[in-house]
Amino acid sequence: MKLTLSWLKDHLDTDEPLEKLADKLTMIGLEVEGIEDKAKVLAPFTIAKVLTAAKHPNADKLQVCTVDVGDGAAPVQVVCGAPNARAGLVTVFAPPGTYIPAKDFTLGIGNIRGVESRGMLCSAAELQISEDHDGIIELPADAPVGAAYAAWAGLGDPVLDINLTPNRQDCAGVHGIARDLAAADMGKFKDPGIKPIKGEFPCPVSVTVEDSTLCPGFALRLVKGVKNGPSPEWLQKRLTAIGLRPINALVDITNYLTFDRSRPLHVFDAAKVKGNLVVRRAKDGETLLALDGRTYTLDSSVCVIADDHGVESLAGIMGGELSGCSAETTDVLIESALWNEINIAQSGRKLGINTDARYRFERGVDPAFMLPGLELATKLVMEFCGGTPSDVVVVGNPFADDKIIDFPLAEVKRLAGIEVSLTEIRRILNHLGFTVVGQAPVVKVAVPSWRSDVHGKADIVEEIVRIVGVDKVPLTPFERGDAPRKPVLTQIQNRTRRAKRALAARGLTEAVTWSFISKPFAEAFGGGQPELALANPIASDLSDMRPSLLPGLIAAAQANADRGSPDLALFEVGQVFKGDRPQDQFMAASGVRRGVASSAGLGRHWSGSAQATALDAKADAFAVLAAAGAPMAGLQIATNKLPAWLHPGRSGAIQIGPQNVLGYFGELHPRVLEQLGADGPLVAFEVILEKIPDPKQRPTRAKPALELSAFHPVSRDFAFIVDRKVAVADIVRAAQGVDKKLITSVSVFDVYEGKGIDPDKKSVAIAVTLQPRDKTMTDQEIEAVAAKIVAEVTKKTGGSLRG
């Protein structure tokens, strides 16, 4: 939001210096991002007169001018290429050493085609005061030669640039900013009433609103017999100062009121409107040639203003070229309306149009100012262009319901920690437009129509505190009682942190990918349901919520491979989505390894290089589970009911019991890699952290006592012949279950298939460690345990001890 100091003073009677006003604006929540003072930037530029202009001896399009720069100085020679440079012309001169804003360089003494030039005659574009660059500036003949140009031209009006927060739509106009400053004791607020202008005849154009939810209020007035020409110089200067281009009086009035009162309006050339106006939804396929020169194709989600001919305006966003006002306009229709904020935002985003009107309507304008805004526009049209006004046509209810809030005065102390008297509270709120009725301890506060952002007691406290001064709020540390502190992190947050550390420790690099993926990718990983499709995706290939982290990691791995880094290991811990309910959202830990990126390390090595395998992915998954507190002894590997994205013969599921699947690991299916446009092979894993069962005992900071046995451990090896389909894990669990206190370790050290073994059999060798606690074991006791192990494995697997 830009405004000039003189513009602000039209609404605020103040003598405060600019710097103090800017500081106060920032302190009350209207952050001043910058101040542009053209008088300082253009200080070196002076008014000069061209005495002679002769053709350059070595260039057809250049002239050698002698210039009177005033102050009794000798004439200066300047080489100029402007077509309008001529003797007797009064213009703007820049001496050597002057910084030229538009060209971003400092002028020096030049030599142009063999002729010395000791300065520059300037165009308006070079001074960045307009877009005119066709010739040098032409000033009146009586302009004082030698005087500072900026001071003479009235450019000493600083421009403030305010960064508005989305909730302060009332300050999208200079009037609202002045109101806030007046409440902060920076001056007296000027708020003259707006008198209705009596119509001289009935308006011949009627208005129909088909959907009042899109347009709660609409007002229209015809002004006949106008003479549309340039707007007054003061208005043109204000619009130019804030970056707008003056067009003609009718259009400039609407732009002025947009920034002055945050009241966007639109003007139609009445001669170009056919029949009556209808506010409706656009028909699919309808088009509009808009004022920006572009043709837009519309659909039924866009609200438009149409006549008998078709669409004439994008409601609340931009008017149409065919009904726009020009110098030939003699009858003008002035429109002032209220529009649905959400529809304006969605339509503007869909069409890719950003306008000052859209900016204000999508944040909400003052509904009570719809009719006064029309009256003020009518007054300015008649003042600048003449004409005779009609009666006003009003459709809908432009008035918002009164909002009354019961406000306990103690809320200021409770929420902000400062004491503010009722007298001061009344003063502040009254200056801001609120009405306060009643006495302590609870008063009733009526919210003004332009403050749609104020909904409750906390909002009123905010208004009081920002005017009193946020710097008045004391620094109050939180009280810390004697009770022990509760954990800051939830269990899932702890698991997330530990999983990240475990994977980083294994050499994987963390990646952060989009939560959105394309529909085909989502379907390949079990997603793609209609409820997971985005209503308004930011890109066509980011249309669905991800059911897995792996599509993003696979794409990242392939992108690195395409750029010369084929060997890498990536992981991510983030949300995945199985449905649209909160309970369908899970925290997953996933990773991929590609190329020579096994657990042993990345890239080639003197000792040999090995491609990453499913066992590397399994080790990564187990590292996550161990870090997250899973009961590792109870984990099982299953090879049935695997997801379609895994290779059926080189993958597995990690589960506890037959139902609770914690995750998957293995090599990705070649068909899925082809669908994702990735080169294989790739190995991957995914663990759902919420599926890990809670520990039976509450975690404690106290470490368990270290128990070391004084007796030697005993190790025994066993080899069993079992069917090939028997899982090795079944043998390990059977052996461990014989005596969980005595047996401290069971590990597999050999699996053999081949000569001497039946084709449908295999030999599995395990090492069992016994750790006595009370005494040294005798041979008989060892043999008894060994016999139990053989019997239990035989019973559970159907195998036999290998001879």
Curated annotation (Swiss-Prot):
It catalyses: tRNA(Phe) + L-phenylalanine + ATP = L-phenylalanyl-tRNA(Phe) + AMP + diphosphate + H(+). Belongs to the phenylalanyl-tRNA synthetase beta subunit family. Type 1 subfamily. Tetramer of two alpha and two beta subunits. It comes from the Bacteria. Residues 400-475 form the B5 domain. It is found in: Cytoplasm. It comes from Rhodopseudomonas palustris (strain ATCC BAA-98 / CGA009). This is Phenylalanine--tRNA ligase beta subunit. Keywords: Aminoacyl-tRNA synthetase, ATP-binding, Cytoplasm, Ligase, Magnesium, Metal-binding, Nucleotide-binding, Protein biosynthesis, RNA-binding, tRNA-binding. Binds 2 magnesium ions per tetramer. PANTHER family: PHENYLALANINE--TRNA LIGASE BETA SUBUNIT, PHENYLALANYL-TRNA SYNTHETASE BETA CHAIN AND LEUCINE-RICH REPEAT-CONTAINING PROTEIN 47. Mg(2+) binds at D453, D459, E462, E463.
